[in-house]
Design a protein with these regions (language model features):
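Conformational coupling and interaction surfaces
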Residues: 11-136
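Active-site glycine-rich loop that binds ribose-phosphate moieties when present
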Residues: 1-6
């Protein structure tokens, strides 16, 4: 990660929060995806069986999030991003538990550190529409 972040190429990162807030597939959407009726839509719901059970057990809802498809959607269409920030980033390269962890510097304490674009929120409706198109 340190080599990539110091490469100078533009980098966009997206964490779990946008997926949990903006790419959550609830019961209604699960049914909509199923009704698309393609092998892709069936696969999309079927592969989430374990996550759906976990979400039922923990949160009491039949739902799942789609972090990887959301990341791909952001790559394909930057208009899906509703909020982002350019921040400095460092990778911990020391030995120990935090080795490889990224530290995001929102306070600009290390202005010479490499910068990344951090996606904070997405337009969930745009993501969902793109998802449905890709499953049709």
């Amino acid at each position: 990660a340190d080599v990539v972040l110091n490469s100078g190429i533009p980098i966009t990162v997206i964490g779990w929060d946008p997926s949990l807030y903006d790419a959550m597939i609830d019961t209604e959407k699960i049914q909509e995806i199923e009704s698309i009726g393609t092998k892709y839509s069936k696969f999309t719901n079927d592969i989430q069986v374990v996550l759906r059970e976990m979400m039922k057990d923990i949160f009491g809802s039949d739902s799942y999030d789609l972090p990887d498809p959301l990341a791909m959607s952001v790559y394909l269409d930057n208009e899906i991003i509703s909020q982002s920030a350019e921040v400095n980033v460092r990778v911990d390269t020391r030995d120990g538990m935090t080795r490889g962890g990224c530290v995001l510097d929102y306070l600009n304490l290390e202005p010479d550190a490499p910068k990344v674009r951090v996606v904070q929120r997405c337009h969930g409706d745009k993501f969902y529409n793109l998802l449905k198109q890709s499953l049709a």
